[in-house]
Amino acid sequence: MRQHVNPLSKNFFEIDPIPPLNQVFENPKLPLHLDIGCASGEFLFELSLKNKNWNYIGIEIREKLVLNANLKMKSRENKNLYFSFGNANNIFNQTNNKSIINLITSISFNFPDPWFKKKHHKRRVIQPKLLNLLSNSMKKGSLIFIKTDVRDLFDHMELTISESIKFKKIPYQDVDFCESFNPNRIQTNREKYVILNQLKIYESIYKKI
């Protein structure tokens, strides 16, 4: 069972800033993908090992998971992977995007916390403020991938992104997945669980315009 963490808590005002990319990646000029809500990071560990022509940053609000991921990094040869702890809004707001401005090629939100109660919808990760912050670090044509098994959350994410003038929904056939951050179509642990239990997956792709 996934443990929910309130992203609006004062505990997350202090964040782990993303340092200059030349300090964390062997080749900082590679295309950059962000996975927001990366959990334990296993998805990114596999991605980064199989796709050496991309750099990956995982952002996770649960500090223990980031600490464990960084411990694993010490025993693995992932020269194109970095983990950052904190609320994504605060990470991008406080760093002013200096380290990654106009460098993000794509972003994924995979099965984020649904926060079912209406009074908690403001805790859902995709909010107008975050989209504005992210757009400042995304190149024109950069992509946002959203995926969930919760229809209400999917509708919320779609509505929030569609209301932004900075993003446009595009059909799947317009995306060359062979050139994407995940050409092997690697699945997260949650996605494997959903498929195994024959549950429906809702997903969309948006382009920065």
UniProtKB/Swiss-Prot annotation:
Active site (catalytic residues): D113
GO molecular function: tRNA (guanine(46)-N7)-methyltransferase activity
PROSITE patterns in alphabetical order: SAM_MT_TRMB
Catalyzed reactions: guanosine(46) in tRNA + S-adenosyl-L-methionine = N(7)-methylguanosine(46) in tRNA + S-adenosyl-L-homocysteine
Species of the source: Prochlorococcus marinus subsp. pastoris (strain CCMP1986 / NIES-2087 / MED4)
Coiled-coil intervals, chain numbering: none
Enzyme class at the top of the EC tree: transferase
InterPro entries registered for this protein in UniProt: SAM-dependent_MTases_sf, tRNA_(Gua-N-7)_MeTrfase_Trmb, tRNA_methyltr_TrmB_bact
Cross-referenced Gene3D superfamilies: Vaccinia Virus protein VP39
Intrachain S-S bonds: none
Binding, S-adenosyl-L-methionine: D35, E60, N87, D113
Residues at which substrate binds: K117, D149
Record's protein name: tRNA (guanine-N(7)-)-methyltransferase
